[in-house]
Amino acid sequence: QSVLLKGYANEGHDSAHPDYADIGKRIGGADDMNTLMTEGAKYGAKFGIHVNAGEMYPEAKAFKDDNVRRYADGSLRYGWNWLDQAVGLDSIYDLATGEREARFDALEKLVGTNLDFVYVDIWGNNTGSSNDDSWQTRKLSKEINDNGWRMANEWGVANEYDATFQHWATDLTYGGYNQKGENSEVMRFLR
């Protein structure tokens, strides 16, 4: 049974993204999260976390002017408005500088392979780079897989190569038929 810890970070769901290693202290921190995962594994549970690689929140330590997304007129490209207003994260900058990979590596030092998968929210809707293309997606998957974790995504079309779970593709009440992933028989044949 896969269990998604959607609100593991900072103060809960969508809080302080993309500080992946900021495991909520008021919910027990890394020690309690590791206990949950090791004890849960005894019952067949495999745990994953919900992260964001396309938006960031002002309270995040990773938040800085160099990696925010802006429109041509200089205004910020805003994303989801949850605990605070998200701002688009320049995912190409994040990849090229190695900052995203370093944040995943910092998380790995805390949880290791007690963690089974990483669910990357919103990847594929172009909030991050305005082009979450296959090359970037494969690099993101590699950063996650190199730490021993499986890759999961929200959108069915976001990561057809490496995702082991896609939320919208499996949730009939989420989105229309065109949001259910790649349905091409030609593509299946070629792969």
Label every model-predicted segment.
Residues 83, 91-116, 123-191:
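Active-site-proximal substrate-binding groove within the catalytic cores of carbohydrate-active enzymes
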Residues 1-128:
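Aromatic-lined carbohydrate-binding/catalytic grooves of carbohydrate-active enzymes
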